[in-house]
Amino acid sequence: MIVRVCMGSSCHLKGSYEVVRRFQELQKKYNFKLYGSLCFGNCSQGVCVEIDGRLFSRVTPENAEEILKKVLQNG
């Protein structure tokens, strides 16, 4: 699984650094690759995260694990 977190200015202002830190904590448990990314073009809905090509919006440190579980369950 590949997780890409938007590091664009809008997402940065909305907390992308904290989201990255949360995903770093979750890496050992869920075994995925984590990358920073340029803007996904959905700035008003940030923080945006792409997981295996699927875009998620309004990602927070609090809902990051729930999103990972959803992707793993639904493929």
Swiss-Prot record:
Might be part of a multi-protein complex, possibly involved in metal cluster assembly. It comes from the Bacteria. It comes from Thermotoga maritima (strain ATCC 43589 / DSM 3109 / JCM 10099 / NBRC 100826 / MSB8). Signal peptide: none annotated. Gene3D superfamilies: Glutaredoxin (3.40.30.10). [2Fe-2S] cluster binds at residues 6, 11, 39, 43. The keyword Transcription does not apply. Binds 1 [2Fe-2S] cluster. This is Protein TM_1420.
